[in-house]
C-alpha cells in the first residue's frame, strides 16, 4: 500500500469526528468545535485500542493538517485594517501578552508543570486561544496530551469570560469602546470574543463586535514574533546539545509560519486592489475546519484518565493568567484614559 493510501483511514476517522464536532460547535459557540472534537477523540480513544490502520493518518492530521490550518488562518488577516484600527489598543495588547507569558514562565516550576503545557497555556491565554496553541505546538514539539490539556484550560476560561465579562463591564462602567478593547484583549478565543461582545451589544443596543474583533485580530499577529522566537530558542538549544557546527537561522525558521505571513500579505494586497474580503471567507472556514480535524486527532492520541488526573496544575496556571490579563487590561485602559 502506498504512503498516501496508508494515511487515508486515519484521515477519514478524523474527518468523521470533525463533522459532528463542527455541528455541535455551531449549536454551542461558547464551547466551540475544537473542544467538542478533542472530547469526541478522547472518548473514542478509551475504546479504540487497535489502531494500526489509522495510526499514520491520525499522526499526519495532528501535525500537517494542523500546520495547513495555521497557514489558511492568514487569509483572515487584513494587515492594513488591523494596523489602522488596532493601533490604539496596541499598548494594552503588548502588556497583556507580556503579563501572561511572564506569569506562565514564572509559575511553571512552582506548579511542577511541564514546560510545553505552561508555554501553551500562556500563549493561548494571551494571544488567540486555540489558534495560537495550534501555531505554537509544532514549533515546540508539544505532545498531543499537552495540547489537549492547554486547549481544555483555554476553553474553561473562554466560557467563564463570555458569561461574566458583560456584567463585569457594566458594573465597572466601561464605555462601548472600552468594552470592545477589554473583550478583544482579555478574552482568549475569537469565537468567545464574538460571544462576549454580542452579549454586551444585546444589553446596551450597541455595536462593539466589530471593534472587539479587530482588536482580537491585532493580537493574532503576535503569533509571528512569538513562534519565531520560540523556534529559534529551541533550535539553538538543541543545536548546542548535539553539535558544534554553526547555527542556521534558515533551517530553524518554521516554514508554515512563513506561509501564514504570506497568506496575510496576499489578503492585504488583494483587498487593497478592491477584492472583497468575503472572497477569502471559504479559506478562513476551511482553516477552522482543519483545526477541528487536528483537534480530533489530538484527542485520539490523548489519555482522558491521565488528563483528568494531571490537569489541576494547568487549570490553576490558566486561572492566574486569566485574572492577571483581566487586571492588566483594565489597568492599562485606566492609565490611557479610555476607562
Curated annotation (Swiss-Prot):
Cellular component, GO annotation: plasma membrane
Compartment(s): Cell membrane
Keyword Transit peptide attached: no
InterPro entries: UPF0324_pro
Transmembrane regions listed in the UniProt entry: 7-24, 28-50, 57-79, 84-106, 118-140, 150-172, 256-275, 290-307, 314-336
Membrane topology: Multi-pass membrane protein
Alphabetical UniProt keywords: Cell membrane, Membrane, Transmembrane, Transmembrane helix
Presence of keyword Ribosomal protein: no
Chief location bin: membrane
Leader peptide range in chain numbering: none
Similarity-based family: Belongs to the UPF0324 family.
PANTHER family in alphabetical order: INNER MEMBRANE PROTEIN YEIH-RELATED (PTHR30106), UPF0324 MEMBRANE PROTEIN FN0533 (PTHR30106:SF1)
Name of the featured protein: UPF0324 membrane protein SpyM3_0740
The species this protein was found in: Streptococcus pyogenes serotype M3 (strain ATCC BAA-595 / MGAS315)
Amino acid at each position: 500500500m502506498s504512503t498516501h493510501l496508508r494515511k487515508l483511514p486515519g484521515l477519514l476517522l478524523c474527518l468523521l469526528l470533525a463533522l459532528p464536532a463542527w455541528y455541535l460547535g455551531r449549536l454551542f459557540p461558547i464551547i466551540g468545535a475544537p473542544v467538542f472534537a478533542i472530547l469526541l477523540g478522547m472518548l473514542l480513544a478509551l475504546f479504540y485500542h487497535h489502531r494500526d490502520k489509522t495510526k499514520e493518518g491520525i499522526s499526519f492530521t495532528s501535525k500537517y493538517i494542523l500546520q495547513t490550518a495555521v497557514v489558511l488562518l492568514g487569509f483572515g488577516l487584513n494587515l492594513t485594517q488591523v494596523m489602522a484600527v488596532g493601533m490604539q489598543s496596541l499598548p494594552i495588547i503588548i502588556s497583556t501578552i507580556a503579563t501572561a507569558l511572564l506569569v506562565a514562565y514564572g509559575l511553571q516550576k512552582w506548579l511542577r508543570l511541564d514546560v510545553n503545557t505552561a508555554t501553551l497555556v500562556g500563549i493561548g491565554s494571551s494571544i488567540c486561544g486555540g489558534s495560537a496553541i495550534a501555531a505554537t505546538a509544532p514549533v515546540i514539539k508539544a505532545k498531543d496530551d499537552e495540547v489537549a490539556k492547554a486547549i481544555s484550560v483555554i476553553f474553561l476560561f473562554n466560557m467563564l469570560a463570555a458569561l461574566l465579562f458583560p456584567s463585569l463591564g457594566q458594573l465597572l462602567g466601561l464605555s462601548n469602546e472600552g468594552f470592545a478593547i477589554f473583550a478583544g484583549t482579555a478574552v482568549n478565543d475569537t469565537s468567545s470574543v464574538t460571544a462576549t461582545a454580542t452579549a454586551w451589544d444585546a444589553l446596551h443596543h450597541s455595536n462593539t463586535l466589530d471593534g472587539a474583533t479587530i482588536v482580537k485580530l491585532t493580537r493574532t499577529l503576535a503569533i509571528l514574533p512569538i513562534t519565531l522566537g520560540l523556534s529559534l530558542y529551541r533550535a539553538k538549544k538543541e543545536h548546542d546539545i548535539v553539535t558544534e557546527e554553526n547555527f542556521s537561522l534558515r533551517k530553524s525558521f518554521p516554514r508554515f509560519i512563513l506561509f501564514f505571513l504570506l497568506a496575510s500579505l496576499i489578503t492585504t494586497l488583494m483587498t487593497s486592489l478592491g477584492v472583497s474580503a468575503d472572497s477569502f471567507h471559504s479559506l478562513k472556514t476551511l482553516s477552522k475546519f482543519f483545526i477541528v480535524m487536528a483537534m480530533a486527532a489530538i484527542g485520539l492520541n490523548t489519555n482522558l484518565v491521565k488528563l483528568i488526573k494531571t490537569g489541576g496544575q494547568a487549570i490553576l496556571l490558566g486561572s492566574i493568567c486569566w485574572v492577571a490579563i483581566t487586571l492588566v487590561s483594565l489597568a492599562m485602559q485606566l492609565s490611557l484614559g479610555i476607562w
